[in-house]
Amino acid sequence: ILRVSESQNKIVETKTILDKIPGSTFVNGGILKFGPDEKLYVGTGSISDSSHGSQDLKSLEGKILRLNDDGTIPDDNPISDSPVFSYGHRDPKGMAWDKDGNLFMTEIGPSKNDEINLIHAGKNYGWPEHECIGNGKFIAALNCYDPGIEPGGIVFYYGDKLDIKKSLLMATLKGSHL
């Protein structure tokens, strides 16, 4: 993750604020958003469907990370001295907060079991050991899609211009759905 400073439409400084995030050819996550708490949230993907890095709290693979804007770790993160906010993710694609500050995330499954999740601090969402359905160890998805739809970006709509007030809108990467 780079912080880029500009002046007069030119890059004047580039600073790495987080490095060593594992990547792969197909599944990388890659979403960055500032939350209502002014922290930077980063969705990282699992490097392969056979990797168990999403379950390893020392790995940055398959996680939602939470950072201060300078790349330091917030004191109130759920895992002490760690950027990990939640784990057990395969391929995070969309993030949005509702008016109450709850974080929702879309996640693409391997060929089915795409998910919409309500993210809780410090919780495990199961990948690659479990998909969609929770148990005492893993958090269940709010919604699971089979066949897969490849969910992408999401946003909450609270306006009054469309007849869809208080709705979560989701774009899909497969087909042509909204």
Residue ranges and their predicted role:
Residues 1-34:
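Asp-box/WD-like beta-propeller blade repeats and closely related beta-sheet repeat scaffolds
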Residues 32, 39-41:
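Conserved serine DD-peptidase/penicillin-binding transpeptidase domain
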Residues 39, 46-178:
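Beta-propeller domain segments
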